């Protein structure tokens, strides 16, 4: 996600029936990781978004007017009055004790070098770098908020997330129309560019025959039938897919039973263009046939516009 502070927000209309008024999400994380964009996206989805409300007033806001007409998103960071790990966790526990509320903690993270670039490009001062170098301020904040990351129900890393993909992730976790049931993100990726940090399950496809070394297949991707057929012709493909689906069949309902709203499954190969793409496509189709909610992303292809 490049420059979360200045990227324009898609203008999507809120659902006609907002509903879900018993839901509360506390949005926190690293400064510059996308809290403002997240709150705006949630607002576009029908949530009431309130930023930097003093923590002592959070419970009062929930109870005001005899309850909430819409679900509530509370933005909290180190600029918030009374901010601290203990006060945030105390407010979270207090809200969770309110009868009938579904309360979640969303933590937004991002790699330090990308945060540095965002603050430098936007010429904004990091709130903890007033009297110290920018990177030192970021590292100090990371140490401060690390207990919140460990406690989070949902963690989204925005390092490589385009704004549109970031909003789709938020919609998957918090969209009012998707209340209930487990949704699955399937993503392909290149090992040479690092693991997707949001992945819950990771599978390695590098043992399969590589279409990269077939001249007529090299410029294509795993979306193309010729590449998909080449990958599927590998004798190891069938047993791998069978083992993978047999593993996922009982796992998916167990994740749903634990209250997980979205699961990210990542499939990797060397370049992220052929084998991992073909398997991710196959896996997404299998899940769709089961009637599941599936979103498919090819990280390397999407970033290159392939």
UniProtKB/Swiss-Prot annotation:
Keywords: ATP-binding, GTP-binding, Nucleotide-binding
GO molecular function: ATP binding; GTP binding
Record-listed GTP binding positions: 77-80
Biased composition (Polar residues): 1-14
NCBIfam families reported for this sequence: PRK05416.1
Family to which this protein belongs: Belongs to the RapZ-like family.
PANTHER family to which the protein is assigned, alphabetical: RNASE ADAPTER PROTEIN RAPZ
Protein name: Nucleotide-binding protein amb4396
Region (Disordered): 1-20
Organism: Paramagnetospirillum magneticum (strain ATCC 700264 / AMB-1) (Magnetospirillum magneticum)
Residues given in the record as ATP binding sites: 29-36
Pfam families: PapZ_C, RapZ-like_N
Disulfide bonds: none
Function noted in UniProt: Displays ATPase and GTPase activities.
